[in-house]
C-alpha cells in the first residue's frame, strides 16, 4: 500500500513565522488563537517497505525527521529511509533542506525537471556545494506525461505534470517561465490503482491540470492564501497571491470553487501561509472549508492510497 506522510504543511517561513506578529502568529505563541504550529511543506511517499521518497526538502527537514520515526529505520550505524528526493520546483523553502542531508553516505538521488536542475546548478548552486559532501545523483524528470518509478518504490507510479506558475525570485527565468519550473505530481499505487495529485504551488488551473485533478482519488493542493489580496491588506507585501504564483482559496474561480467540482474522496489543502485565517480552528473560514468537505493538512497526517 502506498502512504503519503505529511512532514510539513505550512508555506515558506512555517507557522508561526519567526519574525511575524500577525494575528495568527502572535496568537498561537500567546495561546490566544486555537491553532496548530506547522513546519514548511514537504511530504514523504512510502511503499510497502521502509524506503520513502522525500518530495521537497524543507529547511525544517531535521525537525520533520525527528518527528517521523518511520524515516529512521535504524538498520545500521548510519541509516535513513530516504531513498531519493524529488523536487516540485526550485523554491528556497523546497530545496534548502538538501544541505541538511549532506551527511548521506553516498550520492543522494535527486529527481527534478531540467529547468529546476539548471537553477540548482547556476543561480542557486546547491549541486556544486553538495559535490563537496555527499554529492547528488541527478535525474531529469520527464514532463511529457510519461509515468516513472523511483527505485526501490517500484509499486508507485509517478507522473510529473507541468503547472502554470513562476520560477523562484532568484531564477533568471522568473519573468520568463517555462514548462517544468513548477510541477504537480500524480502518485498512483500500481496495485490498488488509487491515486493522489499533489500540487503545493498552484497558480492557475487550466484544462490539463483540471483533468489530472478529476482523475485523482485524493487531491493535496495549494492552500496558501485565503484572499488574493491577503498580504497587501495586512501591509506585508505589494504583491497579490496570483503575483506570487498561488490561487487564492476564496472568491470567484478560487480553489474552493475548483475543489467543489471534483469527485475526489478527499480534498486536502497544504502549503498554508501563516497569515491564512483557516489556521485558526474556530474561524469562520475554517468552518467554510468544513462545509465544502475540504480538509487542512497538518504535520504528521497520513494518507493511504
Swiss-Prot record:
SS bond partners: none
InterPro entries: Metallo-B-lactamas, PQQ_synth_PqqB, RibonucZ/Hydroxyglut_hydro
PANTHER family assigned to the protein according to its UniProt record, in alphabetical order: COENZYME PQQ SYNTHESIS PROTEIN B, HYDROLASE C777.06C-RELATED-RELATED
Full protein name: Coenzyme PQQ synthesis protein B
Keyword hit for Calcium: no
This protein's encoding gene: pqqB
Lineage of the organism: Bacteria, Pseudomonadati, Pseudomonadota, Betaproteobacteria, Burkholderiales
Biological process annotations from GO: pyrroloquinoline quinone biosynthetic process
Top-level taxon in the UniProt lineage: Bacteria
Biological role stated in the UniProt entry: May be involved in the transport of PQQ or its precursor to the periplasm.
Keyword set includes Transport: yes
Signal sequence range: none
